[in-house]
Curated annotation (Swiss-Prot):
Name of the featured protein: Small ribosomal subunit protein uS9
Ranges of biased composition (kind: Basic residues): 118-137
Source organism of the structure: Synechocystis sp. (strain ATCC 27184 / PCC 6803 / Kazusa)
Disulfide topology: none
Chain spans, region Disordered: 105-137
Similarity field: Belongs to the universal ribosomal protein uS9 family.
NCBIfam families attached to this UniProt entry: PRK00132.1 (NF001099)
Keywords (A to Z) from UniProt: Ribonucleoprotein, Ribosomal protein
Source species taxonomy: Bacteria, Bacillati, Cyanobacteriota, Cyanophyceae, Synechococcales
Length: 137
């Protein structure tokens, strides 16, 4: 959705989910900074370049890197799940920006929610699929 920020800047937002992580993403015109839960993205994601590069990938696909600040409220899951949730949220926010952005983002797979999640533990097993050791005699 599109909304006006307190300083009359147009804000585009999107929500992303991955595993147990949920990220609410806002795109604000700016210099390309990433702020996650009030911290710079590089510090929040422990300077792991793959995470930062991953969440900026939808912007790079459209040639918009450096034009929007990414403001994120993320919770749940771990860093990998949160980074992928942010990527989906950024892609959805870019669709709010312009309907023409949808086709290239869809072609790259950025608008697809990854449905894989932790499988539940079953009774009689140690984990989801790990069975107790079998003894024939």
């Amino acid at each position: 959705m599109q909304a006006n920020d307190s300083s009359n800047k147009v804000v585009y937002w999107g929500t992303g989910r991955r595993k147990a992580a949920i990220a609410r993403v806002r795109l604000v015109p700016g210099q390309g900074e990433v702020i996650v839960n009030g911290k710079p993205g590089e510090i929040y994601f422990n300077r792991i370049a793959n995470y930062i590069q991953s969440l900026k990938a939808p912007l790079e696909t459209l040639g918009l890197e450096g034009e929007y600040n990414i403001l994120v409220n993320a919770h749940g899951g771990g860093l990998t799940g949160q980074a992928d949730a942010v990527k989906l949220g950024v892609a959805r926010a870019l669709c709010q920006l312009s309907p023409e952005n949808r086709q290239p983002l869809k072609a790259e797979g950025y608008l697809t929610r990854d449905p894989r999640a932790k499988e539940r533990k079953k009774y009689g097993l140690h984990k989801a699929r790990k069975a107790p050791q079998y003894s024939k005699r």
